[in-house]
UniProtKB/Swiss-Prot annotation:
UniProt-recorded name of the protein: U3 small nucleolar RNA-associated protein 25 homolog
Gene: Utp25
High-level lineage: Eukaryota, Metazoa, Chordata, Craniata, Vertebrata
SUPFAM superfamilies according to UniProt: P-loop containing nucleoside triphosphate hydrolases
Biased amino acid composition, Low complexity: 127-136
Subunit details: Interacts with CAPN3; the interaction is required for CAPN3 translocation to the nucleolus.
Phosphoserine modification, residue list: S10, S52, S60, S64
Molecular function GO labels: U3 snoRNA binding
Protein task: Component of the ribosomal small subunit processome for the biogenesis of ribosomes, functions in pre-ribosomal RNA (pre-rRNA) processing. Essential for embryonic development in part through the regulation of p53 pathway. Controls the expansion growth of digestive organs and liver. Also involved in the sympathetic neuronal development. Mediates, with CAPN3, the proteasome-independent degradation of p53/TP53.
The keyword Phosphoprotein is annotated on this UniProt entry: yes
Stored Gene3D superfamilies: P-loop containing nucleotide triphosphate hydrolases
Disruption phenotype: Mutant embryos are peri-implantation lethal at E4.5-E5.5 stages. Conditional knockouts in hepatocytes do not show overall differences in liver growth but suffer from liver chronic inflammation. Hepatocytes show nuclei enlargement with nuclear vacuolization. Animals have bile duct hyperplasia and polycystic liver. Males die suddenly after hepatectomy due to overactive inflammatory response.
The family this protein is said to belong to: Belongs to the UTP25 family.
Bias type Acidic residues, positions: 84-124
């Protein structure tokens, strides 16, 4: 009997029925082998499979996923039920034929024993069949859920692997297990989670901002009219410029003290903020104040939902103060927005809506992500998430739920042993390049009451934290097949931190991001249009988006982004303090600084004018062998390539170092320049930013353009004393500038001297530093 059963199994493995072939063709998987043995007993289990799946996931899946996953099972069950009777008839005929053959070949007692064995094994096989069917269905459901949970994840291919690990899979990790737990559509507001936004809606700045209704005439007038501006001086921030295109500009003075109860903070922020911010309140700070003077003024502007540009955020001085206060504003905004949605869910559940009442529940955008935080490195993203956890948790004994926390710490944290112990760099370098400095990342964060979900799919996230490069690879470019930027359509709060570092990375990524902010999405992404705010449907989201821009310096490119892309209807506030002394005062060596002004007709012709001025006026003075050991500092990589090609064409004795130069090439170039074997050394600003090497052997210094960071000017000038051999009297420094370099010039020499140099009829100005 056992031999015949094995023979039957081998025949079933080698042959396939029409229905099995049809099943393979329809569903892409092979029909289970043992269905023929235990089909009659397995029928109830297979038919109940979709019901058990629905019942187990009905409360834990989002609506879109529930429909697609259960639809597959219902279709599978329907197909099985339709063909069930035909398959049973065929199997009964085959079993009758086999039984007749068995009666002729074997005795009755052997046949009885064989039948008993058959029944026992059939039961066990039936159990295995049920388990196989359930496991296959579960895998299919998981795959379906994974493909449908985030449309943009198929495009997030690059750079989400842990540091030092090669990318093995083409898709990034996203948390698809906690979809229902953090779904805004299926959750309701807890009784004790109400906040100030529900208690005082008329006074809450959040409610005033999102409920403000713009008119078509105002939009048209703002597009053509110049902004109205007013200036004011604050105690800490200094000189402020208030501007607005939509209304008469309103300025306000910061009060001396801040009452947390009047700031309309959502629970539990009123109680957790003081402890989270306590590290900055030591010393002369008043014990009853929860903000530093700087944080107090910054938060008042943030909480008024005006755009803000603060160009004095430095990693060494006040970077963490600023990070704490904008994280408070971001988490406060998200908690208020989600609380409004959950409260409306409860209202909709408790009452039947009548005609014309849908507008009362318009509380969302076209997509869920409402806050985008752009930071340069993974270490910054790690600190932002840690602040979110601290603000939600505080000193409460009850810990909040943070999903995927261990994975996040592994991918965004760093090992202190990886840093060379003998590496000596300036303090500002140590403050910027701390921790994990990978600049290609993006992560979604979902927040619901007292729970945080890390690695949430973008379209299920409240907050997106990413680098410009991480966003650029998912936004894509014109003509690319795999690109997505719908998740940017309803961003209500955009925070760009450490904007000056993006000038050293790739500023084009920032411009590309700003050009794709608040565009109408190409897909609905399962949105309930009856819950979408009217100004979002009208494609006016950009007039309601608040942008917070933080950097370490005043730069024309950063100013351009703030002036062009920040058009919030509430107005804009920019900090415009001018440097009085300049970084030239930090030059310690005795050195004559010759500033030569070049003329340019317009901004577009500055690049060519500088190049021709350099090769015709400056370079001939240094061609003599006496003027050896000349370092040429070039801020722009494109100018560097142009000069390098020209030097090669003219067969000049030079070497070069840029951010792409290999370590061996850097060592050779530094050695040749120190020994005088190469007369010129071309050095890019980005190399100096990322490495901060001290170049030895400099006797003559040329700044092809003023540095982006003003303190780089004094750093490079002080390199001359690295190899002082009595040639101090022959040292020279030449700087090229134009009238379009006013901001950089003021940062180097001071605003008063810069004004005189730009207005003077003379084109050459001399400064001498280090005089005794």
């Amino acid at each position: 009997m056992g031999k015949r059963r094995n023979r039957g199994r081998s025949q079933m493995l080698s042959t396939m029925t029409k229905k099995q072939k049809k099943h393979l063709r329809d569903f892409g998987e092979e029909h289970p082998f043992y269905d023929r043995v235990s089909k009659k007993e397995a029928k109830p289990q297979i038919c109940q499979l979709p019901e058990s799946s629905d019942s187990s996931h009905s409360e834990s899946e989002s609506e879109s996923e529930q429909e697609h996953v259960s639809g597959y099972h219902r279709l599978l069950a329907t197909l099985k039920n339709v063909s069930e009777e035909e398959e049973e008839e065929e199997e009964e005929e085959e079993e009758e034929e086999e039984e007749e053959e068995e009666e002729e070949e074997e005795e009755e007692d052997d046949s009885a024993v064989g039948d008993a064995e058959m029944n026992e094994e059939a039961g066990s096989e039936d159990g295995s069949v049920g388990e196989a069917a359930v496991s296959e269905a579960a895998e299919e459901a998981a795959e379906t859920q994974e493909h449908m949970s985030l449309a943009d994840n198929s495009k997030e291919k690059d750079g989400e692997e842990p540091p030092g690990v090669s990318q093995k899979s083409s898709e990034e990790f996203t948390d698809v297990k906690h979809e229902s737990l953090f779904s805004l559509e299926t959750n309701f507001l807890e009784e004790d989670s109400g906040g100030s936004c529900s208690q005082r809606p008329s006074q809450d700045p959040f409610q005033q901002h999102v409920n403000k209704e713009l008119k078509e005439k105002e939009i048209q007038a703002a597009a053509s009219s110049p902004p109205a501006t007013q200036q004011l001086k604050w105690p800490v921030l200094g000189h402020l410029v208030f501007s607005s295109k939509f209304q008469k500009t309103e300025t306000f003075k910061p009060p001396k003290d801040i009452d947390l109860k009047l700031l309309h903070l959502q629970k539990p922020l009123e109680s957790t903020w003081a402890k989270t911010n306590s590290q900055f309140l030591s010393g002369p700070q008043k014990s009853n104040s929860s903000f530093t003077p700087l944080q107090k003024e910054l938060f008042l502007i943030m909480n008024s939902y005006r755009d803000l540009f603060y160009p004095e955020r430095t990693a060494l001085k006040n970077g963490e103060e600023v990070r704490h206060v904008y994280c408070l504003h971001a988490i406060n905004h998200v908690l208020k927005a989600n609380a409004q949605v959950l409260a409306n869910n409860s209202r909709r559940r408790s009452q039947k809506l009548g005609v014309g009442e849908d507008d009362d529940f318009r509380d969302q955008g076209l997509t869920r992500p409402k806050v985008l935080i752009v930071v340069p490195f993974r270490e910054a993203a790690l600190r932002v998430v840690q602040l979110f956890i601290s603000l939600l948790e505080g000193d409460s004994k009850k810990k909040i739920i943070v999903s995927n926390k261990k994975r996040f710490q592994g991918e965004y944290g760093s090992d202190p042993e990886e840093r060379p112990p003998n590496l000596k760099r300036p303090e500002d370098y140590e403050a910027v390049f701390v921790g994990n400095i990978d600049d290609h990342f993006r992560i979604g964060v979902a927040i619901l009451q007292r729970s945080i979900r890390l690695y949430a799919p973008f379209y299920s996230s409240d907050i997106l934290i990413a680098s410009p490069l991480g966003l650029r690879t998912i936004i894509g470019g014109e003509g690319e097949k795999k690109r997505d930027f719908d998740f940017l359509s309803s961003v209500e709060l955009l925070i760009i931190d450490q904007a000056d570092i993006y000038l050293m990375q790739n500023w084009e990524h920032v411009l590309h991001l700003m050009n794709h902010m608040n565009l109408l999405p190409l897909d609905s992404h399962g949105v309930d249009f009856s819950r979408v705010r009217m100004w979002s449907l009208n494609n006016w989201s950009k007039y309601y988006r608040q942008t917070l821009l933080f950097g370490a310096l005043q730069d024309a490119q950063i100013n351009s982004v703030f002036n062009k892309h920040c058009i919030n209807a509430q107005g804009q506030v920019a900090v415009r303090n001018v440097p009085m002394t300049g970084s030239i005062s930090h030059v310690l060596v005795q050195l004559p600084h010759v500033f030569q002004r070049m003329e340019a007709q317009d901004l577009s012709s500055v690049i060519d004018a500088r190049f021709h001025f350099f090769i015709n006026k400056i370079l001939p003075q240094y061609r003599d062998a006496v003027m050896s050991h000349t370092l040429i500092y070039v801020p722009s990589y494109f100018d560097f390539v142009r000069l390098r090609n020209y030097f090669k064409k003219e067969e000049l004795n030079f070497t070069h170092i840029c951010e792409y130069t290999q370590k061996s090439g850097i060592s050779r170039a530094r050695h040749f320049f120190l020994q005088g074997e190469k007369q010129f050394l071309l050095l890019t600003e980005r190399f100096h930013f990322y490495k901060r090497y001290t170049i030895k052997g400099i006797r003559n210094l040329i700044f092809y353009e003023l540095p982006t960071y003003p303190h780089f000017y004094s750093e490079v000038c002080n390199m001359l004393r690295a190899t002082s051999r009595g040639e101090e009297a022959t040292w020279t420094c030449t700087v090229l500038y134009s009238k379009y370099d006013a901001q950089r010039l003021a940062a180097v020499v001071g605003v008063e001297r810069a004004a005189q140099m730009l207005q003077s009829p003379k084109n050459v100005h001399l400064f001498v530093t280090g005089e005794k």
